[in-house]
Amino acid sequence: MDNHTVKEIISPKSYCDMIEKIDETKKERHFFAAANSKNGFVSYFDDIFGDESISRIYLLGGGPGSGKSTMMKRVAEISKKNGYTTDHIHCSSSPYSLDGVIIAEKGIAVIDGTAPHTYIPYAAGVREINIDPGAAWNTNALFKRRNTIYALTDAKKKQYRKAYIYLRAAGLLDTESREMTDPYILHEKLQKNAVSSVLSASPKKHSSNPGKISIRIQRAVSSAGNIYFESFAGAADKTFLINDFRGAAKIWFDEAYIQAKKSGLDMTISYSPEDPAIIDGIYFPASKTAFTMYAEKFDKIINCERFADKRGIINIKQKLAFASKTRSSLLAEAYKALADAGRYHNEIEAEYYPCTDYSITDKITSELCEKIFS
């Protein structure tokens, strides 16, 4: 692949531009709850859906082609029509599908309870209620298609293994680049900016009690490419766009996070999908202020280039260029593997469609909506 093709593949793209137009507002929010990362598949389901504000979770079973995502989209649609704050939790591998819905005012969530993002119930039958979309399957008809389904499933798994190998290798190069650059980061200047930015976005009176920390992921390394949402910016009254330079944004967010914890602020954190140790966004609900790396509309830019000794970095420019080019090529291969995995998944679902009675699926969906909204 030439450099232009590689850059096109790995560049972050807005979900609205790549897949479909959506509203990202204070009432309608879109996130991910898992990531394809250098560590393999990482799930934040327990952190997000284990939140004490959620009093009931409907766990959807079944499998490919059983209509789970369609069910959740129907729940989200009714929730929005009723004026509830609705978090759409998209699948990190197939962003056009949903893995979950959270209805804030009702304290209710509906989530995909199947692998790989399984959720461990806290009180099954009390807090967590099982729903089985698989009841709509004709299992005898599916059994006749088993050889095709097995072959496609194995091919899909192979592509995921390949993607994680490339992501792990790209992660090693990213770590190496950060270590080379760190001596040329103006840490004191960066820290002062991060601290003052957080303090300006926080209430005048700080709490001595720990603030509540929530997790919502803004971006995904997916079969559809490098896709991000702008729901931090959509929920905010004031948005700061953080422009990275040679990894300085990671350090900036680390310092901002430390200060926010010291101040006892409630905050919502987003982590990079490639590396779960890297923060790429912080939202403060009390002041409705967002610091994020993904926003088309924003109030102020914090350019991290100002926190680097650019003359010093010239000394390692060639090494950084080599690492960046190699890392980009590895990421491009990871995206290709994920795209292939996505195609195999679609073919698996196509095997299930003729073996599913969607009138039963519709009935299950109606009963679920009745339980939630009655």
Please describe what each predicted stretch is.
Residues L60-G61, M71, S79, D87-S92, ...:
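A cross-family "folded-core" feature that marks the main globular domain of proteins
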Residues N3-F49, E188-S231:
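N-terminal pre-Walker A segment at the start of P-loop NTPase domains
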Residues I57-A76, A224-A260:
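Glycine-rich phosphate-binding P-loop
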Residues D23-N82, G234:
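N-terminal accessory targeting/assembly segments
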